[in-house]
């Protein structure tokens, strides 16, 4: 395992630095590292690492979501309430509809199989989007109109919506039936996640205040460990309560961080944010190398040009969904274009559920996995490059006004 971790960090950072020197996003180098070191090319990673890959990726995602929550200004988020809510489901719905409409023609599958494929492909990748929105908030790009906050909130919620739809469509494809409760669980999951996270954030801040009042100084490094531990518990609550009620662990983590920012002194929340930013340097490498390692490159060769055409057609229709979300707002045409670019990348959800239809024995399993792999390899770099190269041109820097 130690050798595998050495490969992940040293090769991942080296290829990331090479990509940065070539003016490409660092995550491309990390994804390539994962593909090369993974079980489908060099097979250089220990099976013990791969067996806990999903948990390690989740830890990395928790770190950047904590950083995001500690950077969010809730007053700014209130200003973009309607578009943020719509961004959580409308673009994904448009993309799923595109697959249902076009995939039978492009790929020769049934409408139901196309719905399963659309649900796999519908989610935006928080792993690609969230770190960039945090960066843009820190650099004050688009913050005057709360654009990064809106995208961050939408990207944090749309995974829940898409995964519920995927579970429903795949159950029907297996011969089951859709249940109204599955769809009711979507808003329940979001609301309970926010409530749980907010209550937990208040209790954690109260603990820090009480300790300080009794002259028990809690170092910021210890606070980071406490917040991380509580975040892991929040993610576990989602699993524990799954048979009873649906709760979003990721939203609970973001909400807890937002409340900590509100309740703690600005100096404490700033230092916590900085410390999670430093943790992200290592977590980012781990996350994207392991995402790359989960990609079976062989399936891209089987996808063919029809799958490529389908992916781009669906992305085009997805951008119409984003345009609908921001219609009627005070955003300029350039800012609306940036929102569409930010909603392109796919990685984490597709890597997690792309192989599930094949494991379930669905006849569309192989083509769904092929399209998911191709989608990751195309849209993750495309979205990352698009955001990195365009944000200074398309967004206004608040301090320059």
Where are these regions (language model features)?
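Helix-coil boundary and interhelical linker segments in multi-pass alpha-helical membrane proteins
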Residues: 1, 42-52, 101-114, 170-184, ...
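Structural signature of hydrophobic alpha-helical transmembrane segments
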Residues: 1-8, 49-66, 111-126, 186-199, ...
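Core mid-bundle transmembrane helix pairs that form the ion/substrate translocation pathway
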Residues: 5-17, 157, 163, 167-286, ...
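Interfacial helix-loop-helix linkers and transmembrane-helix boundary segments
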Residues: 19-24, 44-53, 70-87, 109-113, ...
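Alpha-helical transmembrane segments and their lipid-water interface positions
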Residues: 30-33, 42, 61-65, 95-103, ...
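Small-residue-rich segments of transmembrane alpha-helices in multi-pass membrane proteins
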Residues: 30-41, 86-100, 150-163, 220-236, ...
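Hydrophobic transmembrane alpha-helices of secondary-active transporters
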Residues: 31-38, 54-80, 96, 169-174, ...
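Transmembrane alpha-helices that form the ion-translocation and gating core
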Residues: 74, 78-142, 297-395
């Amino acid at each position: 395992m130690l050798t595998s971790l050495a490969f992940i960090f040293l090769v991942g950072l080296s290829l990331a630095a090479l990509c940065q020197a070539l003016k490409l996003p660092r995550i491309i180098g990390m994804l390539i590292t994962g593909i090369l070191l993974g079980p489908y090319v060099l097979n250089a990673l220990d099976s013990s690492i791969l067996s806990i890959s999903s948990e390690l990726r989740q830890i990395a995602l928790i770190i950047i979501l904590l950083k995001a929550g500690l950077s969010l200004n809730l007053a700014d988020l209130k200003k973009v309430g309607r578009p943020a809510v719509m961004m959580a489901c409308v673009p994904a719905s448009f993309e799923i509809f595109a697959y249902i409409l076009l995939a039978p023609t492009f790929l020769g599958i049934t409408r139901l199989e196309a719905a399963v494929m659309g649900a796999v492909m519908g989610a935006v990748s928080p792993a690609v989007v969230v770190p960039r929105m945090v960066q843009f908030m820190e650099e004050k790009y688009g913050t005057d109109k709360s654009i990064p906050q809106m995208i961050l909130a939408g990207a944090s919620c749309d995974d829940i919506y898409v995964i519920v739809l995927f579970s429903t469509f795949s159950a029907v494809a297996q011969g089951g039936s859709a249940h109204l409760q599955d769809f009711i669980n979507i808003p329940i999951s979001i609301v309970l996640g926010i409530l749980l996270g907010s209550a937990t954030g208040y209790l954690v801040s109260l603990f820090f205040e009480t300790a300080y009042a009794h002259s028990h100084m809690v170092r910021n490094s210890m606070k980071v460990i406490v917040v991380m531990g509580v975040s892991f518990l929040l993610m576990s609550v989602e699993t524990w309560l799954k048979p009873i009620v649906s709760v979003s662990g990721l939203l609970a983590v973001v909400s807890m961080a937002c409340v900590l920012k509100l309740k703690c002194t600005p100096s404490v929340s700033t230092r916590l944010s900085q410390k999670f930013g430093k943790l992200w340097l290592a977590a980012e490498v781990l996350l994207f190398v392991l995402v790359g390692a989960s990609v079976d490159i062989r399936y891209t060769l089987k996808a063919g040009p029809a799958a490529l055409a389908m992916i781009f057609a669906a992305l085009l229709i997805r951008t119409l969904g984003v345009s609908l979300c921001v219609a009627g707002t005070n955003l300029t045409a350039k800012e609306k274009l940036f929102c569409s670019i930010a909603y392109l990348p796919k990685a984490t959800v597709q890597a997690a559920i792309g192989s599930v239809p094949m494991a379930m024995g669905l006849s569309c399993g192989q083509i769904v996995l092929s399209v998911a792999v191709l989608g990751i390899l195309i849209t993750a770099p495309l979205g990352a490059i698009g955001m990195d190269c365009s944000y200074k041109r398309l967004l206004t820097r608040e301090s320059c006004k």
